[in-house]
């Protein structure tokens, strides 16, 4: 029954929208621009329609990451740091971005830039697709610093830096003889308060588990076992052993509130932005509220535990993975990595990031495993969970750097290695590989790395197919300004062939 339910949902994909060739920015449409010569009712070209769709996607992603940092600042009662991008970015890049008009105009203007990006894509505003593409890069930079960097830095300051440890993961971490509480989403504020509660000796009957990026964050910082990535969140509830699923923001499937109705599970929403039918809404805005809500959740979960059906069992085994790396605790220093690259002992660094998209059937994990003989691998997000499940996160060739916002750690690793090599980032053999994107956030993260001068691979069409004129334009524009490339390669074999033939530093430059 559940399988059919999911299959039916997957059948609802629009093949035209998938390529970005549908404009629904006004009510003269929606208009389809299947061919290059097609125009929308207002005269918008295919290039304009596709570029506007990409920008709206990027704006969605940037708003999520910048919102994450903003919520954390508000929670901590802190102000935005002054001149943040200037402080964090390499100076040559800061000057380049400034020269080409990619920086927010003033303090706090980054949210205005996201809003202006939406404005520029409304019907009858910007008709220059080249300028629309420029906006994508601008929002990528905002996402990188006012989202990824700031959220990571604040959380590290308050909740501590991760530590290298062996973590447990998979549905097997759910304990049949305990009250199971899952924390799910991206902003681990309440999850941190729950950890403190759960570690009190009167709460030894509680088993706290993580899902999605909140799960990655608490796994890396505290060793809280991780039950599932985005793709498996429904399976967590379907075990029938979850008393409460506590969600914050982003990547929380609306389906879970329906699914929870079939079990005894209580869904608890904890952020003003995220409400769900049939859920208990307990928003938190400060530390005191977080502590009180954490306390209430535990007693609510215990009550729900009385309704759990008897004799439930978990069939899946636990997996283990080495987690908890960050930019300063990799086994090799930036200088050692730079030297290995210079001496050709290492062909480069590949960061595998992003989601785990069920529509992608190709076996990227197998390819990464093969390539790890020659390349050092970093990973974050849901795809990191997939690599862990395949047994690759042994702390030798693959290094797990946390959640989606922790892509800031990858940017830092790249910056530090390039600095140690006395080169600019675009001179180094670095690659971002996002084989299975789902969320808009994967696209804005990609735009950020492209603006840093790192090549970005997507393994799934993101409103763009490689034969389109706009894809070629994006390629050229990036090459000219940032010496980087965003490219699509859906076939692992083809990807490997290109990599082996020419290597990272030359093929994609
Ligand atoms: S949770 S953005 S499905 S990685 Fe960060 Fe996973 Fe992608 Fe959400």
Would you name each region that the model predicts?
Residues 2-509:
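Anaerobic metallocofactor- and corrinoid-dependent redox/one-carbon enzyme cores
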């Amino acid at each position: 029954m559940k399988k059919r339910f999911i299959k039916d949902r997957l059948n609802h994909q629009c093949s035209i929208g998938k390529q970005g060739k549908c404009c629904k920015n006004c009510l003269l449409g929606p208009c389809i621009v299947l061919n290059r010569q097609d125009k929308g009712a207002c005269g918008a070209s295919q290039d304009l329609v596709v570029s506007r769709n990409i920008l709206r996607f990027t704006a969605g992603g940037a708003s999520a990451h910048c919102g994450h940092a903003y919520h954390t600042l508000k929670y901590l009662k802190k102000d935005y740091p002054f001149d943040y991008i200037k402080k964090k970015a390499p100076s040559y890049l800061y000057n380049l971005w400034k020269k080409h008009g990619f920086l927010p105009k003033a303090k706090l203007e980054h949210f205005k830039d996201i809003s202006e990006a939406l404005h520029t894509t409304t019907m009858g505003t910007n008709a220059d697709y080249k300028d629309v593409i420029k906006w994508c890069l601008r929002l990528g930079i905002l996402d990188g610093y006012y989202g990824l960097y700031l959220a990571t830095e604040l959380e590290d300051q308050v909740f501590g830096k991760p530590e290298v440890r062996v973590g447990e993961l998979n549905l097997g971490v759910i304990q049949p003889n305990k009250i199971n509480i899952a924390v799910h989403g991206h902003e681990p504020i309440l999850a941190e308060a729950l950890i403190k509660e759960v570690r009190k000796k009167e709460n030894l009957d509680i088993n706290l588990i993580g899902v999605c990026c909140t799960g990655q964050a608490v796994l890396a910082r505290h060793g809280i076992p991780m039950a599932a990535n985005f793709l498996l969140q429904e399976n967590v509830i379907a075990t029938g052993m979850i008393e409460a699923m506590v969600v914050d923001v982003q990547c929380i499937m609306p389906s879970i509130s329906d699914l929870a109705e079939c079990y005894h599970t209580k869904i608890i929403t904890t952020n003003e932005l995220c409400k769900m039918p049939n859920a208990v809404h307990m928003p938190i805005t400060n530390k005191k509220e977080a502590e009180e809500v954490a306390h209430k959740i535990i007693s609510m979960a215990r009550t729900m535990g009385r309704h759990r059906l008897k004799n439930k069992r978990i069939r899946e085994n636990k997996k283990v993975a080495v987690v908890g790396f960050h930019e300063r605790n990799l086994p090799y220093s930036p200088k050692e990595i730079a030297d290995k690259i210079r001496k050709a002992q290492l062909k480069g660094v590949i960061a595998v990031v992003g989601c785990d998209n069920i529509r992608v059937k190709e076996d990227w994990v197998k390819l990464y495993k093969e390539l790890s003989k020659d390349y050092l691998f970093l990973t974050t997000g849901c795809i990191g969970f997939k690599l862990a499940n395949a047994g690759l996160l042994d702390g030798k060739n693959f290094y797990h750097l946390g959640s989606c916002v922790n892509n800031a750690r990858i940017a830092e690793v790249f910056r530090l290695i390039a600095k140690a090599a006395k080169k600019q980032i675009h001179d180094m053999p670095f690659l971002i590989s996002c084989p299975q994107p789902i969320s808009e956030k994967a696209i804005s993260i990609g735009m950020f790395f492209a603006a840093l001068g790192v090549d970005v691979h997507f393994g799934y069409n993101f409103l763009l197919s490689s034969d389109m004129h706009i894809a070629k334009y994006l390629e050229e524009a990036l090459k000219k300004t940032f010496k980087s490339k965003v490219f699509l390669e859906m076939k692992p074999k083809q990807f490997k062939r290109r990599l082996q033939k020419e290597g990272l530093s030359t093929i994609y430059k």
